[in-house]
């Protein structure tokens, strides 16, 4: 992958970067963890960033724990009042895609209680009884028993869909927080030839949803993220400009002299 310089050095020195305030950008697509928040903490300058970007801002995240409503509520508590329809999340969109493809087909969903409830509200049949599909999300309750059940379902012919491929994301302290990709690695350590379909970044699905809702095209959209392998590779594949930032330093420096 091409390694682009981030927009801010670890010691806080700014680098030259694309002007996020330029009117050319009809949509600013932004990653969540490491860019706007870290866990339950809003990063420096992000409230001002969100106010300045306004209606051009779309969150495109490999979050596979929350529904748009649950994440929207958390963000509002952090002073980030971003409308739920602007939160495009890998887990929620994986659930939505399956509910639209075959709503009556049973799906074994390994995910948070929030996402399971979201799937049921969309009419998806969540069941481990002869499912057509196994949907793997960031299930913090994932354990040996869950791994055995997944392996049995795949052996029986179920399709494997993975919300997001990230192995981890950095905590505010810099330590890795396990992600869905780590759970996938456990499956693939036993079934190395297992085929699977990814919904989240770097695949185009989330980017396409954001552009459709924004009513724009890739050449008029800018992706901001801290992960070259997901944010950067996904943007590159669509011909979209990408601006890489250092994880957990916030986005206030991107505003330059803009006032809020």
Which stretches of residues belong to each language-model region?
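Asp-based, Mg2+/Mn2+-dependent phosphohydrolase catalytic module
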Residues: 1-52, 58, 64, 68-86, ...
């Amino acid at each position: 992958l091409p390694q682009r310089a981030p927009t801010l050095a670890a010691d806080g020195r700014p680098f030259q970067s694309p002007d996020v305030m330029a009117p050319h950008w009809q949509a600013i697509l932004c990653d969540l963890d490491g860019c706007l928040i870290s866990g339950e903490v809003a990063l420096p300058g992000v409230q001002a960033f969100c106010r300045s970007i306004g209606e051009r801002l779309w969150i495109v995240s490999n979050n596979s724990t929350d529904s748009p409503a649950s994440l929207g509520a958390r963000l509002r508590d952090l002073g980030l009042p971003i409308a739920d329809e602007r939160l495009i999340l890998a887990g929620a969109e994986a659930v939505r895609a399956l509910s639209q493809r075959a709503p009556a087909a049973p799906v074994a969903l390994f995910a948070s209680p929030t996402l399971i409830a979201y799937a049921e509200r969309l009419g998806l049949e969540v069941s481990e009884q002869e499912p057509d599909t196994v949907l793997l999300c960031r299930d913090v309750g994932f354990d040996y028993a869950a791994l055995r059940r997944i392996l049995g379902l795949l052996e029986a012919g179920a399709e494997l869909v993975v919300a997001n491929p990230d192995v981890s994301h950095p905590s505010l302290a810099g330590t890795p927080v396990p992600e869905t990709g780590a759970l996938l690695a456990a499956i693939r350590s036993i079934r190395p030839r297992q085929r699977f379909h990814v919904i989240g970044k770097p695949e185009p699905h989330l980017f396409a949803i954001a552009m459709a809702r924004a009513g724009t095209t890739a050449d008029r959209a800018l992706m901001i993220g801290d992960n070259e392998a997901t944010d950067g590779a996904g943007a590159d594949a669509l011909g979209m400009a990408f601006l890489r930032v250092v994880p957990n330093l916030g986005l206030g420096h991107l505003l330059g002299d803009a006032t809020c």
